Amino acid sequence: MNSTNPMTGPKVLHANLKRGRLEVEVNASTFAAQALFDFAERRNPKRAFLFVSRVLGRHIPARPSLMAQSFNALAGKIPADLPGPVLVIGMAETAVGLGAGVHRALSQTRNDCVYLYSSRHP
């Protein structure tokens, strides 16, 4: 994951799936989109695809140092002078781990961080 060359123009990523072609247009990104995620197929009539993270280690193995780098990069986007407390929310599935990692990284520099998570299941 290298942020020294942020993306400046639109880039179209695509995947040829059994149920059709999926295209994603990325207009701006600090990191190269293909370094962050890939596409996967699902056997689900409501949504035949899944975006899988290359940096979270859930579906594709990732080095812990890469995971920490992504959490630190996201936490670094939160203004240091933001009035607290700061609430970080992980909403269902993969975002629960992402939120926990961002909270942990943010807690290195702030003592007023709170983390909440939710599930899509009751």
Q: Can you say where each PLM-predicted feature lies in the sequence?
A:
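PRPP-associated nucleotide enzymes
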Residues: 1-122
